[in-house]
Amino acid sequence: LKQVIFKADDFGLSPAVNGAIELAHREGVLDGASLMVGARFAADAVARAHRLPSLRIGLHLVVVAGRPVLPASVVPALVDASGEFSQRLARAGFRYFFLPAARRQLAAEIRAQFEAFRATGLPLDHLDAHHHLHLHPTVLGLLIRIGREYGLRAVRVPHEPPGLALLANEPGRWGRWLSALLLAPWIALVKYRLHRAGLRTTDRVVGLHDTGRMTATRLLKVLQTLPAGSTEIFCHPALSDAEGPWPLAVAASRAELDALLDPEVQALITNLRINHGGFCDLPHPKT
């Protein structure tokens, strides 16, 4: 049995992103999206989500490269002079691990983002994090503890297994294979902690190394080579009139939207009898 979750990140970032996510769910294969509760266009994203009750919405936790939900004066150890989280992941990770004040403020900010999500009235399908920073041990521990209070049931574990990288048979696959191999012990520990807390995860994730390149051709190849079990396939779609602080080239994000709408992709899912839905459709973890 193959179970796939097609998911988009950065819901709320811009009208072009929000519109692409709505279109990809209405007319394509997109199952869910991750909401940036502090983003400028989060309210627009929430309104769209309420019109689409079958779209599974999760929390896209932002604790780096963005703005906090709490006032900067409440979390001074987390932000720079402009009130933004650090753009430097290593620096942020160091502070979150070693500075007690940063850890206390980080806990408060994570709680505030869960509160903001709860205020939307949307069911919480899952959690992931901007730049995958929930793999950081401090962030991971806090989201498990705090998330329990807000009904958190599933978390993305961003790891593409080594074997899947080789199956891709593409340039750079050996580098992807080595990266996945080196991360495997830490990923196993992350999954153990999540499963021990009763949180669901997929068996694997696809898209981690393909940001901006999840085209229809790539998606068809992935679907044909997927092993049995559960897989999250995530992407960053946007309409061709993308605006604002969008990290991808407009053509790349439009290509990812086109992949989600592609009739061949939809036909292959049917022909291979692939089930797709949300994180909360996954079985409870075995501990």
Which residue stretches match the model-derived regions?
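Active-site histidine-anchored catalytic micro-motif
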Residues: 129-131
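DG-centered beta-turn motif at the end of beta-strands
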Residues: 8-12
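Terminal accessory/targeting
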Residues: 1-5, 15-126, 137-287
